[in-house]
Amino acid sequence: MIKPEARLHILYDISKELISSFPLDNLLKAAMNALVEHLRLRDGGIVIHGSGGEPWINVRAPIGDDVRSRSLTIEQADAINRVIASGEKHFGKNSVVLPVKVNRKAIGALWIDFAQKSGAQDESLLAMIAVLIGLTCQRDRELCSDGGSVAEEQQAGQIPKIKPKPHPTQLDKIDWIVGESPALKRVLATTKIVAATNSAVLLRGESGTGKECFARAIHALSIRKSKAFIKLNCAALSETVLESELFGHEKGAFTGALLQRAGRFELANGGTLLLDEIGDVSPQFQAKLLRVLQEGEFERLGGTKTLKVDVRVICATNKNLEVAVLRGEFRADLYYRINVVPIILPPLRQRDGDISLLAQVFLEQFNNANDRNCDFGPSAIDILSKCAFPGNVRELDNCVQRTATLASSNTITSSDFACQQDQCSSALLRKADGDGIGNDAMNGLNSRDTMSGGLCAHAGTPSGAAATIEAAGLTERDRLIKAMERAGWVQAKAARILGKTPRQVGYALRRHRIDVKKE
């Protein structure tokens, strides 16, 4: 029986392996290794059939001295073949065989023989892993021009080529996402696959990586594209206001509620709702949110009539939800509800070659908005390409606009950039967090405390005091008290020091049971 807290680590490790850029067989081997590391297995493996129906990938659990010398028993082979043929899962005494599906068709199987009795929760976890494997296989096939697989072409000695489909449609075009890097193309391929379903999506990545842009892309590529796309930043509102915004309210529900008002769920009925910064929702509100996500029904604030809606919910966060679950700050059931298909957005520093493309787009937007005719000199793009951009695409946009505004001529040169004049505001972030700034934020997982990671995880720009507090090596509680003392116990001022919102600071004060002093 797998412990509840271990399931989160297993799911994270498997997801991390499957989103890598290695060949499919290597990804599946890495996933199998992760399963062996976390589970007590007697045997196990992943079998994937090629586009012609023949077995072409057979990954075996690395148990024992020589994996290659082991062959499947008649019972194992029979169970695997039946699952692939029927698309239905199979259970043995201490074993389970789950179908791996692409476009609802079983193209392989994940089979596990447990060394001890398993439970329903173990089988549920493995079912989620089988779905992730299926999405990985589908992405691999999407990258091949003839509907086969990149891995199949590589095995045949061919060089896989990414070509447009014979009859491209408007659905293949996402104008507002710019880039040609392999990291971005992988995410776009997954986005197009996920958009064709109604599955819940969790967009994860550092601040400024474009989570809202990808949410819009999922909506635009889905069958819901003709309906509304509604967004809400959960971190920007207090719990009471957040409830009213999401669920709406009746006339007279509270002071100032002069009219009945529809909430975001009602407005998004039939369409898509983006809940940004979902990791900042309080535990009390999480229970209310879980109900509408599970049942699709709710009541307006102050009302008694139950309303039903059909909404696809996309959540986004730059927080480490797994750690939040383990700390009891985020409900595990809500985590599983929103994390059906996680999409991890790469930071700008991992998108080779995209900085120059994005910079040209942002400069063109600046020219159109200000009736200017600026362009980049030869050395300007080199300067931009060497920057780490901890604020990612958002910071690059700001950098281009600021430089174009203050440039001495219409041709932007290297000397026009703030970083060449020792005036780069993001230098404080890099100094506070080191050169490897935000390396884990792409996965929403920081090894450090949430408050310490807040310098890079939030859009707010921290003050110089934040770097001092950060560098002091204090605990999260002590850092919070230190910031409040410097701010004269004014939450709004402390929030600016820490680079967080007042609501986040208020929640942290309650969580650490810190009484606010009157000065």
Swiss-Prot record:
DNA-binding region(s) in UniProt: 491-510
Coiled coil stretches, renumbered: none
Subunit structure: Interacts with sigma-54.
Lineage: Bacteria, Pseudomonadati, Pseudomonadota, Alphaproteobacteria, Hyphomicrobiales
Disulfide cysteine pairs (residue numbers): none
Protein biosynthesis among keywords: no
Residue numbers spanned by region Inter-domain linker: 406-476
Name of the featured protein: Nif-specific regulatory protein
Function as written in the Swiss-Prot or TrEMBL entry: Required for activation of most nif operons, which are directly involved in nitrogen fixation.
NCBIfam families to which the protein is assigned, alphabetical: nifA (TIGR01817)
MF term (GO), any: sequence-specific DNA binding
Domain Sigma-54 factor interaction: 177-405
Residues at which ATP binds: 205-212, 268-277
CDD domains in UniProt: AAA
GO biological process, alphabetically ordered: nitrogen fixation; phosphorelay signal transduction system
InterPro entries in alphabetical order: AAA+_ATPase (IPR003593), GAF-like_dom_sf (IPR029016), HTH_Fis (IPR002197), Nif-specific_regulatory_prot (IPR010113), P-loop_NTPase (IPR027417), Sigma_54_int (IPR002078), Sigma_54_int_dom_ATP-bd_1 (IPR025662), Sigma_54_int_dom_ATP-bd_2 (IPR025943)
Residues the record lists as binding a divalent metal cation: C419, C424
Keyword terms, alphabetized: Activator, ATP-binding, DNA-binding, Metal-binding, Nitrogen fixation, Nucleotide-binding, Plasmid, Transcription, Transcription regulation, Two-component regulatory system
Organism listed in the record: Rhizobium leguminosarum
Lineage top rank: taxon: Bacteria
Stretches the record annotates as C-terminal DNA-binding domain: 477-519
